[in-house]
Design a protein with these regions (language model features):
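Acidic, glycine-rich A-domain
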Residues: 1-158
Length: 158
């Protein structure tokens, strides 16, 4: 399947618009499309901080939350080690969330269950990453080399 013209958010935006239910055949097509997306990721870990607040659901075509959730999942699936299949919530009390689900539909819905309306404490976000590294005895090379924050909200003063 050629997915060169599709982006991760195209797929997740479809899920958001149909989160009340989707036929099994449609879910299979979305999952196959998701799995066929090109890999633009280097070998470095990239951790995404995902804002899922209500304001991210605005807009008439592609919703900002679709961009945040899709890139959170996209990079998480390509990470290695302790950060594989994880993203961080955009929150006053951020969480490192392990993504669960059998297909992209379930994964997107699972990630959306962590949505909250909050600003973020960036210092706590970095503490969370550091504590995860210490707990898992990670080497420097296993740490995320990039942190991407996708939000339309505000940051607390660090």
């Amino acid at each position: 399947m050629k997915t060169g013209s599709l982006t991760p958010y195209d797929i997740v935006n479809t899920i958001i618009r149909n989160r009340g239910g989707m036929a099994s055949s449609e879910r299979k097509v979305l999952d196959a499309t998701w799995n066929a997306l090109e890999n633009y990721v280097t070998s470095d870990n990239t951790l995404v901080v995902v804002d899922g607040s209500g304001s991210m659901y605005g807009g008439s075509s592609v919703k900002p939350v679709a961009v945040a959730e899709s890139l959170g999942i996209y990079f998480a699936e390509r990470n290695k080690g302790a950060f594989r299949n994880h993203f961080i919530t955009f929150s006053t009390n951020p969480q490192l969330v392990e993504i669960k689900g059998r297909d992209i539909f379930e994964k997107a819905l699972y990630c959306m269950s962590y949505n909250e309306c909050s600003n973020t404490n960036i210092e706590k976000t970095f503490d969370l990453i550091l504590n995860t590294a210490v707990k898992n005895r990670l080497k420097q090379s296993d740490m995320p080399s990039r942190l991407i924050i996708i939000s339309d909200m505000e940051f607390d003063i660090a």
